[in-house]
Amino acid sequence: MTTVDAPVLVGTPRWVRPAVAVLLLGTAALYLTNVAISGWGNDFYAMAVQAGTWDWKAWFFGSLDPGNVVTVDKPPLSLWMMGLSGRIFGFSSWSMLVPDALAGVGSVGLLYLAVRRLSGPVAALLAGALLALTPVAALMFRFNNPDAFLVLLLVAGGYFLVRALENASTKWLLLTGVAIGFGFLDKMLQAFLVLPAFVLAYAVAAPTSLGRRVWQLLAAAGAVVVSAGWWVLAVALWPVADRPYISGSTNNSVLELAFGYNGLGRIFGQSHGGDARPKLPEFPGAEHGFGGQAGLTRLFTQQFGGEASWLLPAALIGLVAGLWFSRRAPRTDRTRAALLLWGAWTVVSALVFSYMSGIIHPYYTVALAPGIAATVAISATELWRGRAYLAPRVVLAVMLAATVAWTFVLLHRTPNWQPWVRYTVLVLGVLGVVALLIGTARRVVAGLAIVAALLGMASFTVATAATAHTGGSPASGPQSERKGRVSFGGPQQSNVELNRLLETTTTKWAAAETGAMQAAGLALNSGKPVLAVGGFSGSDPAPTLAQFQQYVASGDIHYFVVAARNGRGGPGGFGGSRGTSGKITSWVEQHFPATTVGGAKVYDLTQS
């Protein structure tokens, strides 16, 4: 064979284009309406976006300040997008968050295109709708964390792989590698979680010889390395004295950050780079890296359940059933190829998220959403096509029953929020299951089943979009769902008096403060550059004491600020009083006078 069996592209019904338009416009409305409600979102990344609108070098490296002392602890791809928007439209909450919302619309559109080519427009529309209506998707596509662009690039990679599967195209497979490589530049090794699924689907179903499949996959691996490696190489070759310190690394290296703090450290529990380890237990509930105990049930816990698990049971049931029913199909069967791609995406990502022992946030599961959405849509559509037989109807009924039962449990966790929703879901779900089992397989039954399956999840999604989200660990769903959630890095209470003081400065940095989570509030509220001593948590050795002393001697920093920490440990909120940042603070306290400005202790570094 020279092509995957019968790509579903011919004879598209007239209703499809209007339906796609409704899907994309509805997604845009959901993600863009009042998008600025969250203000600066995660102040840490907002500070870097702001710096990128001031200085191109800061934009390229993802620096926290235009003086390029230290970067964020992630690669800068998402900051590039938000920074360009800020340069075009002016830096604001709106200009920063709109690119993330558009990434969401693009992800839904690309998922539709990918599923349509192998499974037809009905499955494709359903997959797009399921992704759009996943609560954690609405959360992250309206927020400024890197995850929005990660999902866009991963779904783009899935689309390119589907195109490669159709006729064993090397070009499309190389583009798959490029998409994953750029995903690395957004969130490092998390982008590689889909690689097992991509390799499996292509190795099994590509319509060409085994030898050609192998060398094509090796070429695609090369594309990953090149598209990810150019920026890594640029940073490595850039003179160290002329670039910012790579936050989170132990030796100022992007590769060490990728395989250390942002790689194996996330899997096995290593905490942080720099010269002082953050003390996560200083945040109540953060003893297990913000994600609770690792284990097979993690994705169904109070912390994770409401994010992306709504359809996970149905996806697993549909995947197993779909693979069983297609077991005798030709190697290049399109349905099995699609299930291998999206199903393996779901299973591998779910297992990794479940067993990570390091830092993990519930919103990471947004990377699961495309796999779950596509797997459910494809398996449900194929089972519906076989509804004349008992076995497919039984599997559909089980998928629906599992979804309704799990939705009821999730909604019951917020008993005071719209209780009518969970009971409506239960009633409609029971009716749908009964109708499927007795063989009343009409379109009205399909509609009933879809409403029952999606009503609870969609309600959570609407609640998510209507609520402001701030800090480093945002959560989806109604406000009551967040009780007990661990968060940090949210907006600091604005010190109006201090902001006015900083606005009068003309130095390179208006002020310096330990830890980006505190310094970001000063920079964003005053509109002036602020040096985040020690990077994200105050634990990075940047600047060194000698460098800081040179900045002060050169008149580059006007003030050093020590704000109240609300009982959260040392400067920066992660015990940043140790290490290099602690030495800098001690030196300032010994050599400069302090005054109190709006409750903050402020040292004037121009007076000694």
For each predicted feature, which ranges?
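Short secondary-structure boundary/capping elements
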Residues: 121, 335-336, 359, 490-494, ...
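Short low-complexity, flexible loop/linker segments enriched in glycine and/or proline
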Residues: 207-208, 546-549, 576
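Alpha-helical scaffolding within the catalytic cores
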Residues: 242, 250, 542-552
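Membrane-integral, polyisoprenol-dependent glycosyltransferases
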Residues: 1-394, 402-406, 463-465, 536-537
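Transmembrane helical bundles and short interhelical boundary loops of multi-pass, membrane-embedded
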Residues: 387-492
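Extracytoplasmic/secreted proteins, especially bacterial periplasmic and envelope-associated proteins
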Residues: 44, 48, 76, 80, ...
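Short secondary-structure transition/capping segments
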Residues: 203, 523-524, 543-546, 607
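Short periplasmic/luminal acceptor-recognition loop of GT-C membrane glycosyltransferases, typified by
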Residues: 455-460, 464-538, 553-588, 592-606
